[in-house]
Curated annotation (Swiss-Prot):
GO cellular component, one term: extracellular matrix
The keyword Transmembrane is assigned to this record: no
SUPFAM superfamilies in alphabetical order: Serine protease inhibitors
Subcellular locations according to the entry: Secreted
Disulfide bond sites: 616-672, 637-686, 648-703, 652-705
Residues with glycosylation annotation: 553
Chief location: secreted
Protein name as catalogued: Otogelin-like protein
Keywords: Disulfide bond, Glycoprotein, Secreted
Keyword Secreted set for record: yes
Amino acid sequence: KIIVNRLARKVEVDSIVVPLPFSSQELSIEDSGSMYVITTPAGLIIKWSHLTGIIDIHFGFRFNLSSYTEGLCGICNEDPDDDLRMQNGTIITNMEDIGLFIESWEIEKSFEVTMRRPVRNCTEHDCSQCIDLLNRRIFIPCHDKVSPEDFCEKMWINYTYFWNYECDALSAYVALCNKFDICIQWRTPDYCSLSCPEGKEYQPCVRPCEARTCLNQWFYGHSSCLNLREDCACKDGTILHRPHSTQCIPEKECACTDSEDQPRTAGEIWNGGIDECALYKCLENGSVIPIEPDCDEEPTPVCEREAEVVMGIIDKWTCCSKEVCGCDATLCEPTIPTCTNGEKLIVGHSPLSCCPQYKCECDPLKCPSISTPECREDQFMIQVQQEEPCCFSPFCVCESCTKPVPLCHDGEFLTVDLNSTHFCCPQYYCVCEPNLCPMPLLNCAEDMNLVKENVFGQCCPTWHCEKDDVCVFQEVSVLNPGQSMIKYLEEDFCYTIECLEEKDNHTGFHTLNFTLVNCSKKCDVHQVYTPSPSDYDCCGTCKNVSCKFHMENGTSVVYVVGSTWHYNCTTYECVKTDEGAIILNYTMVCPPFNETECKMNEGIVKLYNEGCCKICKREERICQKVIIKSVIRKQDCMSQSLINVASCDGKCPSATIYNINIGSHLRFCKCCRENGVRNLSVPLYCSGNGTEIMYTLQEPIDCTCQWN
């Protein structure tokens, strides 16, 4: 049994890894550095790409139909009916059972098998995702050879793996394009990129089947494959060390290869021994020779650490013996302490000694388990030492109180919030009790009153003596704050007297405010003066008896009550109210109108509603003779100017009438056509020979509606 593991780059024969090339009973397997090339006894050549995993099968020169083949590729005998033969000889005829055929040829199952069931097509199922992918500009050069529709129909729609992995689907499409020598550079660093091993770089179109290696560098002939392919190639200046390796090295390092299959440069010396020293050297001609170590005598080191002695060792790189300082544990005399309960013995090392250092450290695992209390939000947990010095128990303690106890003022007493007494810091606050406030000690004069004034944020009120809360005018009239009165003077003048909220510090009463008002007022032409009916207003007002309308040009017009007028598509009306005449307006509303559509349908735009609205009027144009100016051409001859040529244009009547006698519609239709013609001679200038000819055409004498 032969297993080719592409990902691990190894070939097993009967569970034993064999080197390549391998050959047995006309079966050969070789690694070209870029692909496995497998030649079967039947003459089939199978090329399996290392990078993409695409398998390419060719018929070799030795292939013939008499050679027996079997397996997933079927029996190559030009008979498709026996291609689905299982390993036990049974032939599958129902496509629903194709899974049994695949499983019969399966080796040790180490992964999930995806079965292809060709029962879908793009007619009944959605292939738009696949078509959109392949219709990108980068894939257009291949469409003539591999159409997107065929690929999506035969591969994508029946291979559900492609639905979720579009990069693999595109890789399969590009592989088909490569068979026609069409190079498509479709991968980018950000889209479907392929990672190559260190030292290699991705190339979208490679033709040589065999990679250039240290083994074939002198006779490498760029062996060509039948088709292009994607591959990872060594960077410029480097070649592949071995076909089965992924290591790219400079050509100068190809001189030698050691027993571990590692490259060595000319002049390089290395230790090739496993358990003992064996120095080898690479010569310019690629030969590997054993050499003796070249050792220099070194002074004996001075060992200063405790229990450190001089030892002899062999350097694995130079194969030379040398003396170094090493630890001899037999020289140590350790002092091991006795640990108590809750402690454990710790072994440490000091840079000044080879001997171990022993000490006892606390071991929390040896302490008795104690349940952890749940601390409140205003508490935090501390560890309190128990009787054993190494063991601690958790304990909840209070946070420090940041808010001080408030200081209460007159009329207040200190109390605590009962909902906070269980906390570390209870909430204290002062409560106002008016009965605790002291009595006022003021004695007011006879014309003054004792007044209490509550102060915001203060429990007890303040007391003071003040006069009545009024205004006094001329020691006779009394006004409350906010009230006013009028005092008339001669002519058109008067003044108002208002009692303010502010106090007059001189009198103790509220302050009076005096305002002088000139009531002389000139009313407009559409207004009349009306005296004030109120005892609190000095002056009267101008009242509208008609309406004054201002226009956009700056002029104005006066309208009497009851008048209506139109201006800028708005109707105005002068209306009488209790406050005087006012102007009401009503905006005209026009139905929707499409002026462009009207003109396209040969309509005429008309205005109505005082020119504010538009309507489309269509006028029928009857059949008539019209004159058309045009240039007359005949081959290479044409008129030198526009010629007036008569034509017929216009509409004629037509109708469809149901005839009850025959049980169907009769159609009547007249056409606008000529009513007699006449000849019209036109001179034409011919550019070919430079001559002038007379050309005769016909034009209608008159036009009428006539039956067809």
